């Protein structure tokens, strides 16, 4: 049994030692390479800052190198804040470039248009002009018309099938600058912008309206900006970063991308606005790859740049734009028809058939595709219907929006049988006709129309086709349709879908064996050259936690230096914005970015300060680690992996750290209060003496109460033992207290103080003068206290008497000195007073004399002036005499 007890004691001791020396505590690390997803605004950087849309972007120095990270991260091109911001920002630029400012609602009136032109372009058709369709037995044209750079029809705009531009001249009457008089105006419209009523065949004019009048109020652009492409890149604010999936197998969604790189800015991109195709993209490679939506069949296909696919569009004619003043403040841009120009058109260059064939082969190999493997059954098709931007290929050419009918192009690429098509569509050509609209449907927000003033002159634009927007549908493995799409937003998912915006979280929590932070001798290191960039410390993101923790000082310094550098660049841009009268979408983003960066840094420092770890790279605390079973593998785990493991503990640890810091501050406050005892002068402070007196009174009262309690306890103990105190009164003062005894009990004999009588009564003594005794003892105690206090005060007086005498003598000497100085001051003041009085008298006499002289001079001058007429009269009298 004894051996078992010894073993149990040894086990308890070992457990106690283990609990003392093996407990782990929370340690705060600042500068760890970790991050989390973010949704804050990005800002732009560009080399070409002389265009209207990029004046407020940061200058692009091209130094945006990428660092490879040994981590695994998830990427999604559709659920992505970078692509969503790009779509919204480009839309804002698009809307700003054609921002309306003049209401054209007065033009929603009846216009008289040339009937022959309205009949020609299919707006009206009387009963006498109806023509029958061509007979089915007519020969079908299957001619393949191809054009290239050397074709003569390109320069002359007379390639086969191209017609004149569909323009109609109209007249309307309304009030002009003179509101009480009407005026007739002439205006030229595109046929697609008008809607006409069916008129009589004898009329020479058709009644037409603007086709927007039944939907909304159109406004005309009043600035000189046109929607031209803008090249720029997105950059993350300080404290944030952009991760990119560098895996060639990435197809728009990858939950575990192992090839991750980090940078502060994206690649350069262009503001594309077109349907069906993407132009001048930056993602083209020597391969064809597909971004496929994770939940439906929306795709964006990047075309192989090896095939050199191009599209060149042209709007022929020397168009003239004439502003027409409708009324005060309203100007409408008119287009007088000098001669009938050819319609706009586009032709396609490059190996398009080979490119489309490779697209089909890539679709077959894609893991999401489960349709037919026969590429002959995969067809490129046009959408069935909808808005013009869907049924036509819609693009912008230097401010003019072209709507191109793509039947000829699809027939040529797919080698279709054209015998069953309409007469005008029975051709295989590598060029397509286009028509122009001035009233367009916007691509980002539904139901809003804008009016664009046309550009003058001959317009030509050349583009490189880099992507294809399509929906891929298949049925039971028989047929697969690649239906061209009008989702303009998909272009930016291809451009930026491999990026991901993250917020750098440099504060990490991990358990260590050190309980508190101890400061040792610090050595001042020489300042080294700043080599790492703002994101340099993320290079250790794939390293183990132990290795990354060894460079926290340099990493945190790099983080702060990068924030300061980017803040200075943003500040320069904000200063330049003060000179601008009009801000683009980048103006507010730059301001938001600056505020976001400052807020993030201050937030991190405030959090560290709340834990008592401000401006420390490694901060040990007194908070025990809450989960002993969860510890990091310092040699294998990365900080990003560790942050994911302890994410559920972060809130609890944060609360414990704050509570520990509050307790630490309370302890420091109490410690600071004790520091006042180090100063000898504080001992003579009046407030301190009052405290000392209070403490003395408390001690005296405590001693008195303690003595009384001890005495009472001793007295009660002796009374319970049956002994009479030695200071009790003599027997004559005893008062017998009779008690009734049970007759059946035997009588006690031999009891001290008892006569041995065997009756039923007995008595025991009680001190009747006990109160007198207490009073005498209290008087003695008070006398002792009085004598001691008197002795203390007399000795204090004896000690303080020489000090008071010296102080009195010093005060007397000071008084004598002050009285002497006061006498000197009084004498000096009297002398100064007399001098001032003498000066005043002298100045008064001088001024009085000067005033008399001045008055005499003025009086003589006045008399002389008044005597001038008299002298003149006297002179004339002498002359006449």
Swiss-Prot record:
Q: Give me the ranges of the annotated region Disordered.
A: 737-761
Looking up Gene3D superfamilies in the UniProt record yields: 1.10.287.210, Human immunodeficiency virus 1, Gp160, envelope glycoprotein (2.170.40.20)
Query: Where along the sequence do coiled-coil regions lie?
Result: 636-668
Segments carrying the region annotation (V1) are: 113-169
Question: Motif Di-leucine internalization motif: which residue numbers?
Answer: 880-881
The residue spans the entry assigns to the Cytoplasmic side of the membrane are as follows 718-881
Region annotation (V5) ranges: 477-484
Marked site (Cleavage) residue numbers? 527-528
- Residue ranges annotated as transmembrane are 697-717
Q: Which cysteines are joined by disulfide bonds?
A: 44-57, 101-222, 108-213, 113-170, 235-265, 245-257, 313-346, 397-461, 404-434
The yes or no answer to whether the keyword Lipid biosynthesis is present is: no
Q: Which residues are tagged as glycosylated in the record?
A: 37, 70, 114, 148, 158, 186, 200, 204, 214, 246, 249, 280, 286, 297, 308, 318, 373, 379, 462, 478, 627, 636, 652
> What's this protein's function?
The surface protein gp120 (SU) attaches the virus to the host lymphoid cell by binding to the primary receptor CD4. This interaction induces a structural rearrangement creating a high affinity binding site for a chemokine coreceptor like CCR5. This peculiar 2 stage receptor-interaction strategy allows gp120 to maintain the highly conserved coreceptor-binding site in a cryptic conformation, protected from neutralizing antibodies. These changes are transmitted to the transmembrane protein gp41 and are thought to activate its fusogenic potential by unmasking its fusion peptide.
Q: What protein am I looking at?
A: Envelope glycoprotein gp160
Task: Give the species this sequence originates from.
Answer: Simian immunodeficiency virus (isolate Mm251)
């Amino acid at each position: 049994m004894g051996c078992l007890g010894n073993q149990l004691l040894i086990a308890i001791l070992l457990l106690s030692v283990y609990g003392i020396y093996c407990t782990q505590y929370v340690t705060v690390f600042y500068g760890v390479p970790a991050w989390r997803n973010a949704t804050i605004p990005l800002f732009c950087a560009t080399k070409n800052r002389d265009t209207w849309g990029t004046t407020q972007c940061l200058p692009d120095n091209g130094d945006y190198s990428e660092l490879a990270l040994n981590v695994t991260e998830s990427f999604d091109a559709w659920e992505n804040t970078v692509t969503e911001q790009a779509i919204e920002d480009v839309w804002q630029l698009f809307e700003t470039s054609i921002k309306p400012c003049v209401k054209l609602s007065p033009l929603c009136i009846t216009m008289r248009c040339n009937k022959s032109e309205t009949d020609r372009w299919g707006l009206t058709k009387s009963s006498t002009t109806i023509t029958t369709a061509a007979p089915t037995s007519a020969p079908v044209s299957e001619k393949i018309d191809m054009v290239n750079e050397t074709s003569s029809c390109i320069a002359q705009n007379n390639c086969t099938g191209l017609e004149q531009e569909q323009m109609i001249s109209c007249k309307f009457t309304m009030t002009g600058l003179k509101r009480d008089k009407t005026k007739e105006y002439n205006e030229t419209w595109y046929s697609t912008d008008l809607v006409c009523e069916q008129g009589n065949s004898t009329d020479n004019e058709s009644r037409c309206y603007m086709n927007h009048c039944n939907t909304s109020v159109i406004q005309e652009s009043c600035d000189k900006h046109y929607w031209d492409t803008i090249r720029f890149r997105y950059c993350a604010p300080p404290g944030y970063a952009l991760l990119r999936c560098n895996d060639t197998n990435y197809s728009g969604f990858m939950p575990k991308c192992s090839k991750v790189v980090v940078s502060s800015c994206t690649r350069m991109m262009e503001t594309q606005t077109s349907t069906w195709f993407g132009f001048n993209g930056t993602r083209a490679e020597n391969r064809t790859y597909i971004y496929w939506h994770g939940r439906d069949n929306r795709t964006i296909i990047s075309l192989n740049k090896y095939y050199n696919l191009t599209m060149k569009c042209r709007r022929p004619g020397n168009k003239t734009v004439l502003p027409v003043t409708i009324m005060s403040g309203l100007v409408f841009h008119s287009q007088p028809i000098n001669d009938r120009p050819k319609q706009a058109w586009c032709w396609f260059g490059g190996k398009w058939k080979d490119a489309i064939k490779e697209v089909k082969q890539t679709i077959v190999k894609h893991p999401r595709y489960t349709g037919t493997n026969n590429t002959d059954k995969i067809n490129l098709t046009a959408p069935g219907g909808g808005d013009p931007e869907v049924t036509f290929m819609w693009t912008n050419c230097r401010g003019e929006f072209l709507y191109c009918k793509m039947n000829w192009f699809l027939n040529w690429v797919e080698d279709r049988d054209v015998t069953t098509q309409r007469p005008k569509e029975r051709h295989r050509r590598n060029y397509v006709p286009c028509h122009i609209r001035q009233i367009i449907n916007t691509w980002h927000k539904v139901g809003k129309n804008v009016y664009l003033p046309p550009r003058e002159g001959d317009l030509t634009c050349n583009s490189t086709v880099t992507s294809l927007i399509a929906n891929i549908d298949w049925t039971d493995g028989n047929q697969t349709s690649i239906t061209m799409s009008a989702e303009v937003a998909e272009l930016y998912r291809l451009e930026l879908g491999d990026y991901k915006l993250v917020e750098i979280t440099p504060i990490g929590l991990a358990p260590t064996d050190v309980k508190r932070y101890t400061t040792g001798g610090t050595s001042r290191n020489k300042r080294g050259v700043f080599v790492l960039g703002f994101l340099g410390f993320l290079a250790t993101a794939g390293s183990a936690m132990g290795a990354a923790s060894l460079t926290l000082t340099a990493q945190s310094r790099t983080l702060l230096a990068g924030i300061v550098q980017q803040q200075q660049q943003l500040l320069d841009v904000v200063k330049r914005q003060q000179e601008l009268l009009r801000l683009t979408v980048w103006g507010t983003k730059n301001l938001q970015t600056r505020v976001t960066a400052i807020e993030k840094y201050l937030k991190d420092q405030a959090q560290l300060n709340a834990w008592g770890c401000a401006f420390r790279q490694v901060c040990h605390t007194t908070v025990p680690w809450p989960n002993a079973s969860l510890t990091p593998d310092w040699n294998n785990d990365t900080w990003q992996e560790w942050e994911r493991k302890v994410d559920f503990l972060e809130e609890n640890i944060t609360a414990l750290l704050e509570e520990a810091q509050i307790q630490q501050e309370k302890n420091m406050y109490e410690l600071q209060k004790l520091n006042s005892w180090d100063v000898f002068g504080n001992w003579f402070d009046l407030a301190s003496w009052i405290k000392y007196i209070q403490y003395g009174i408390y001690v005296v009262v405590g001693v008195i109460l303690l003595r009384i309690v001890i005495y009472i306890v001793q007295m009660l103990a002796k009374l319970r033992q049956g002994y009479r105190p030695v200071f009790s009164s003599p027997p004559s003062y005893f008062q017998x207290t009779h008690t009734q005894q049970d007759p059946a009990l035997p009588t006690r004999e031999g009891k001290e103080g008892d006569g041995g009588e065997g009756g039923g009564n007995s008595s025991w003594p009680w001190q009747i003068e006990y109160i007198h005794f207490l009073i005498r003892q209290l008087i003695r105690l008070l006398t002792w206290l009085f004598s001691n206090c008197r002795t203390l005060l007399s000795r204090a007086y004896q000690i303080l008497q020489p000090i008071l005498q010296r102080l009195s003598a010093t005060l007397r000497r000071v008084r004598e000195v002050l009285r002497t100085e006061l006498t000197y001051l009084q004498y000096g003041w009297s002398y100064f007073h007399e001098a001032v009085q003498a000066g005043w008298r002298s100045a008064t006499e001088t001024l009085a004399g000067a005033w008399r002289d001045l008055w005499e001079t003025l009086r003589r001058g006045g008399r002389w002036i008044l005597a001038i007429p008299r002298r003149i009269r006297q002179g004339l009298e002498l002359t006449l005499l």
